[in-house]
A protein has these predicted regions:
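Juxtamembrane extracytoplasmic/periplasmic/luminal helical "stalk" adjacent to the first N-terminal
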Residues: 1-57, 66-76, 116, 129, ...
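Short, solvent-exposed secondary-structure junction/capping segments
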Residues: 48-52, 85-86, 176-177
Length: 206
């Protein structure tokens, strides 16, 4: 009888802990989704309030970037693209203006989806980052506004949830690659070693 009671208590306690973790994860996921939706809305409004002709001017684009940053310091840089994927103007620390993005996965996606939030990728800057891009319709056809989200700021947002003294929060994409850095170790875009275990646990719950 004692063995049965101990086993039942251990199982009951474990189930409680797992449900608490799931509830915390769901709540934090909603917070992250809201953050990304707000930044996409900022970018969409900025594009709708201007034009390709205006934002192709470096000063006009710099003014827009200042307005974006006044809403959120999570914006790291911004660029404007024509309908062929040419990077017409850029505000940020990299030399990206004039480059051709027509074959980039994010550019192909935003042509179809109107708003696109990427996974972490390297791109021309050869550094892990992710972007939000929006499509806008102009007199001469569609054009695109793209902003990079500050990786450290986003990482801090994801890590802001605390689960006990040793728990941690991080994001992985559908392929199981780290999208934020775990405190326990691991680099952006590396495979998460426990990804298959998480998938199995989720299937058992559902």
């Amino acid at each position: 009888v004692c063995t049965t009671l101990v086993y039942y208590f251990a199982t009951y306690s474990r189930d409680q802990v797992e449900e608490k973790l799931r509830s915390t994860a769901r709540g934090h996921a909603r917070l992250i989704d809201e953050f990304l939706e707000e930044r996409a809305s900022d970018l969409r409004f900025a594009a709708a309030s201007s034009s390709l002709e205006k934002l192709s001017n470096d000063k006009q684009l710099a003014d827009l970037f200042q307005r974006l940053q006044s809403n959120s310091d999570a914006f790291f840089d911004v660029g404007v693209f024509n309908n062929t994927g040419k990077h017409l103007a850029y505000v940020g620390p990299y030399d990206l203006a004039g480059k051709d993005y027509s074959k980039e996965a994010w550019f192909k996606a935003v042509q179809k989806e109107k708003i696109y939030i990427s996974d972490v990728f390297l791109g021309y800057r050869n550094y892990p980052h992710f972007i939000i891009a929006v499509r806008n319709e102009g007199e001469s056809g569609p054009w695109y506004l793209r902003a990079t989200i500050n990786t450290m700021a986003f990482n801090d947002l994801v890590e802001s949830v605390r689960i006990g003294r040793t728990g941690e929060a991080y994001l992985v994409n559908r392929e199981g690659l780290f999208q934020t850095k775990p405190r326990s170790g691991g680099r952006l875009m590396e495979p998460a070693p426990d990804f298959e275990s998480y998938q199995k646990a989720e299937k058992e719950v559902s």
